[in-house]
Amino acid sequence: MSTLELCEKYFGTRDVYKLMELARGAGEKEVKKAYHKLSLLVHPDRVPEEQKAESTEKFKVLSKLYQVLTDTQKRALYDEQGVIDDDDESESKLSSWLELWSKIFKPITEEDINNYEKEYVESELERTDLKKAYLGGKGCINYLMNHVPFMKVEDEPRIQKIVQDMIASGEVPEYKIFTEEPAAKRKKRHQKYAREFKEAKVIKERLKRRQKEKDDQDLADNGGDLQQMILARRNQRESNFGSLMDRLMEKYGNEDDSDTVDFSAFEKKKKKSKKPAAKQETKPKLNGVKAGRVEKGKN
């Protein structure tokens, strides 16, 4: 299938700008932020196993569109004729797109995420996102949980008050699924998040124990100051922490356009490095962001 056919299949439209939520005159910075925001929702390393197959295809489509919209000639071809060049077979490889993604977006630390959460919660930006998610999900609270950053079940009374005020003022329509949510649905959601929280806590403790065992073993094998070794290892882990969302990129990342990847140079490098008997491709590992209650997966 062509890229535009895949756009229609997975996103319901052939309009690249509509899909990316961009104006036709959007610049590279806006394209980059839009790609980051959408790709985080379908990144293969950040979705449950049962969603990986479809999410991988969506991720590849979004990456292709990012490439088109940041390439002057390819974008002009699409703008003028509604055509996307699908000749490069190497673009179908997930590893190529994952490598590009890791080059485009700089790492963000857990401290950055925590600081941003403090600024975001109860801000005007949160209200804007809440309104958009309420309309997008037609009042479904499960949808809100998955689309409003940092929202958790403890926030439901506060969120309901904000939306009720919007309804009362006529800013948004009333959806019965929100104002009269069935108790069974609410109970199921709360049980789901309570279960996921416990599972995440167990996994976190397990990882901490394994890391401590490794640090102790390193000390026994190599000697040295344990505190300095742990600090160095922690800094290394933080430097590899995955990006959370486009607004975090905007706040803590480099705003300069110079960090935009040169796709043409990247493609030439890929083609030049190809050999008849190539070694098995090693997929670059991307650390998913898992900062306690920040992670959201399924409805």
UniProtKB/Swiss-Prot annotation:
Residues 266-299 are annotated as: Disordered. SMART domains: DnaJ. The keyword Ribosomal protein does not apply. Residues 268-277 have a biased composition (Basic residues). PROSITE patterns: DNAJ_1, DNAJ_2. GO terms for cellular component: cytoplasm; nucleus. Pfam families: DnaJ, HTH_DNAJC9. Residues 15-82 form the J domain. Disulfide bonds: none annotated. InterPro entries: DnaJ_domain, DnaJ_domain_CS, HTH_DNAJC9, J_dom_sf, J_domain-containing_protein. It comes from the Eukaryota. GO terms for molecular function: heat shock protein binding. Keywords: Phosphoprotein. CDD domains: DnaJ. The modification Phosphoserine is found at residue 239. This is J domain-containing protein CG6693. It comes from Drosophila melanogaster.
